[in-house]
Amino acid sequence: MSARTDELEAAYQLAKERGELQALNQIPPIEEWFYWNRVINKFKHDKFYIVHEMLVLKRKPRTYWELTNYEILELFRDIFPELDQRGYHDIFKGNFKPMRSVDDYFHIHIATYIEEYR
């Protein structure tokens, strides 16, 4: 089961098959911090979210969980409180291995639920 509608899931799978998916750190940021970028998720989970963005590291770590203390601190001490204060997003989440479609690049989903889930 996908969090995307059938149409968007088909577009995602086609882009994946064709090798057309952008590396997360190559997606143009809509906001930047020292270690992190906020980017729009082109293949959003549109069954649940009206807005679906991601926080991605500017660098690509060697393994999924290899974040530095500085990157973690910026995320939890600066970015999350700032986004929470704005009141625009409803959730932040990361996926464990069984649910990751991008398994080689640590990223956090930030999203706003569609009205029926609020």
Can you describe what each PLM-predicted range is?
Residues 1-118:
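HIT superfamily nucleotide-processing domains
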